[in-house]
Amino acid sequence: MNRFLFPRLNSSIIRLCYRSTSTNFGLTNRDRKRFYKKVSVVESSQIPTKYEILLDQHKLKTPLGNIITIENEFLALALAQEWNQQYKKIDLSSMHLYSLINTFIDNPLKFTKNQLIEKLMHFLDWDTLLYRSDQPEELRQLQIKSWDPILLYINKEFHTNFQSTYDLHIKDLINKNDRYIIEKYFLNFDQSSLNIILFIVEQLKSILLTICLLKQYRSIENIATLSRLETEFQISHWSNVEYYHDYEMMDICSKISAAYLIFYCLNNNITRTILTNETN
């Protein structure tokens, strides 16, 4: 059984976070003392093509008691590193990878693939980029400058005709053909990926920005800023709470980073061999 051990002080993978209320060890969202000395990744004895995480000799499980098995080696290493970065205390609220992986393994709400797509399409009807503010004029111009290139990219990439409006009461802003094209795009992904996509959409309140992220059209930081354009505008003009603003941006970026890392690993076969070859 191959085993990859992690030194306690290794911090090569960024700490990514999300809320989790409990684990198979009975932990709650409160900090608990670290009870394990080392974290390791092992090949699954049941499924050799998958990997498991060991805390000392204990297999890591989900809140519902399912052993966490991961097909992608790099994702398993990242999850192990997240546990390894808990030093004296275990801060579950900071462990976004663990929480997101729990969600698509346990599927606590029992969503089917079609139900996940239906929930995603609901966000399209009220996409942040499509419904805009016409006042003040400075904000209106900022939206045009910042969001119009995104719409142009989506329309060119998918041969759609998405258009924005300043009328919040307009009905049927999105035509049936455009809805069908976006829905067909999501049908390409499996249920685990759709769970992750839904999480990103819920953070950004925008399917169109999420698609740009999935296609690597813009950086995570830029996507997060675009999703909060009106908030950023208000803060820049009237807010003096600089540190709270920085915390909010770091929080949303860390959550989206964790989700995108999982999405990318689920849809790409990344191994330590590939990473080693690319860095040499």
What are these regions (language model features)?
Residues 1-31, 280:
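N-terminal mitochondrial targeting presequence
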Residues 22-110:
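An N-terminal structural lobe/cap that precedes and organizes the functional/catalytic core
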Residues 66-70, 128-131, 138, 209-210:
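Short cationic amphipathic helices and targeting signals
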Residues 71-74, 78, 145, 203, ...:
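Conserved active-site and cofactor/substrate-binding residues in soluble primary-metabolism enzymes
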Residues 114-182:
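Internal, conserved structured core segments that host functional sites
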Residues 174-240:
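An internal, amphipathic alpha-helical element
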Residues 224-280:
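Long hydrophobic alpha-helical segments typical of transmembrane helices together
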